[in-house]
């Protein structure tokens, strides 16, 4: 299953899942997506 955590590095409104995911990768997550304009990172747990 996946665990989620709000991104610490993402700045501004989250409008693009791709941008969010690439920021999440720099935070050692495996991906990410926008959720209510916030960038939420995901990784297996």
Swiss-Prot record:
Protein name from the UniProt record? Defensin Tk-AMP-D4
Write out the function statement from the record: Plant defense peptide.
Q: Which organism is it from?
A: Triticum kiharae
For this UniProt record, the keywords arranged alphabetically read as follows:
Antimicrobial, Disulfide bond, Fungicide, Plant defense
Question: What are the cysteine partners in each disulfide bond?
Answer: 3-45, 14-34, 20-39, 24-41
* Family annotation (InterPro entries): Defensin_plant, Scorpion_toxin-like, Scorpion_toxin-like_sf
- What's one GO BP annotation on this UniProt entry? defense response to fungus
- Identify the SUPFAM superfamilies for this entry: Scorpion toxin-like
* Domain of life (superkingdom): Eukaryota
Q: Which Pfam families match?
A: Gamma-thionin
Would you identify the family this protein belongs to, as annotated? Belongs to the DEFL family.
């Amino acid at each position: 299953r996946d665990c989620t955590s709000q991104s610490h590095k993402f700045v501004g409104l989250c409008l693009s899942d791709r941008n969010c995911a690439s920021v999440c990768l720099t935070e050692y997550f495996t991906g990410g997506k926008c959720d209510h304009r916030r960038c939420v990172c995901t990784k297996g747990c």
